[in-house]
């Protein structure tokens, strides 16, 4: 079975690659339509001024002409007209008419006009007409959409993304209020561990990208493919129940306003990487695409694990001879990073129908070199004595990162009341790494021992997301129906991770290096180990929501009912195999072979049953597992405006969750987890509108956090970078969180915002990663009884003209300062006498998150300059035990700079600088228990980084 699962790697890669080709074909055959030279387009969105919701079925008329159209399900409209200046009339039943003057339509251009409508009471709805200018109306529409959301949320638009140096979605997340990034890819919202977030792509759930943690790596999506990114921080009945930090909604582009082509190219220089020497090894011819072509696969006709354990010594020698001698390392040079991207799109109006497509291809290859000093210590928890160093190692890391993606979205509007969309995204990320480790092991009461270790491995992630969605508006009773069916699949493979380990003696001058190989044991602690891992996961989901207004027009009462049902099925297959070279015959083995260099020691000439090596299977029965989970849900939600200034969004969500996991222990005993749980999740969001620009929000919700498949499985995996073994815990249970939020927000206009939020979260049975009591070099996952998390979050995005009280100042009106600061405290209640800290923060919780920056934007000259700063506070990485103190991560300060200059309407140049401060990344034992890095703490790992300077060109047709 294991062999068959590993063979599935090539099949899955081929099928995903086939989908990649299909997306390319779609992009090639989609037509492009050019605008007529003497006409232009008027496009925009109509929203309800009191709720911020879009208004389908609204009539748009061009006064003095016969031109008219209706908004579609999403409140959007598109209207072609001859070039000129017009007055636009907007009508919708139940709302005052709106007349907008001074609307300019340019030849061959596209004019954006977003409109807000005011709810009318009684007889006034048929006679009142409100007039406004085009420029002011656009600003008002943006303001209304920002302030009228029922949930607390923050986000960033595609236009803002273009002004940053960000390459992928992980970089973009750092710009969102209260968010930060760990390991350059995992989201931290309000300082909470990444496990408390939910990731959604165009409304459909995304599976975990990691085989060993509950997290989604947001670096898999190129930033150029995004339409917007929103983090919802408070729950409502329509949102998934499993989150406490935020629901991260990644939305890709759909209907283009007009036909376009865009080509981008950039290159970058890293101060400690580019043009420096690097070590490499023989990989495959398709590594540059981010995929392995099979060069790292297991040899053909390889015996299964069970068969390997039955082989004779001579037969194991034959198996050893099947493997290539692929251990040699080569000297190369790190070249500058390269990035290419093409995006295109078009739309065609066919009467009242509209067909549109957006497609994109992106490719990015970057390099990274850094050093990491790794130390381990012997120290008693709470002891005042100086710690004794057990090991002192220095890692040289040589990494090549590849990211490739394709997007193809097709949308069809069958008139103003029906829209069908098909959205597809395929992404490949890979990391090709060589690690060289040198240093000293100094066991207590033993001679010093030096080691030289090398590891080389290739990690590949492939994600395919495809979804079909529909939106329908029923004009007769103003009902809205939305449905979605989607599939997301992830393939994560680590083919042929190879490790060598040589030992020497510091007491012997010019020591000879000997490979650490025995006659019986194999694994990451021995030379010549090979590891093959494959994780296949898929999510199939579907949902439907229906929305109906229940307004009492005569009383001026607005009420909206939304109900929905849906479900998702998620399954995972994880398989792993491990091999290692051993002495075929201890008595007759040629000991001189252990002194052979890396490139020679495992050559075919050294595989024999008397004086050479054979191959032994190191796979354990716990190294594979199968798991699946089924979630079915239903919700009912009311959005009510009882008084003019008050709004109440409230509802109930029911989620039935069934989870199954099947595995084995190392002793081949069956491990089976079968659980079913029905949860009723209430949510209430109250909004009081102080005036047109200010809101006060109060909310409560109950949410969940469920154990990940990997966290339940007893599989043990050795992490070369941390030197820890990670194991699962089948006894984990789901956690519940009660969330309370209060927020004041002010929108002074022109895209400005200021807000203050207080939040409190009460956790029951939160899940943490903690050091095992019996093995201090292993960590697992545990439930702690209770925890609380509370804090304040400040956000501001203001023009300098507003700050200095000079609204008409030309320069200050072009400069925006933005900042958000989250101050967070958490406390875990421990009933465990063996806990490392009697009072401590929640694992992964940062005490503060800071994002700040300044931007200058001159539309006349086409110049945009921005600088952004991000930092988080020190946080617990791994919870300690009675034998071992907790490991903490020191927060890094990140400073980025960007300059974008439009040369003309088609060409722009972008200069960026990332991580200008480049502080070291430090993990440490908090010896003095002050919950931060300070002199006297034991340093565990310390990695260095260098700034990256990039130069890019973008050309638009």
Regions found by a protein language model. Name each.
Residues 523, 535, 542-545, 593-594, ...:
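Outer membrane beta-barrel strand-and-loop segments of large Gram-negative receptors
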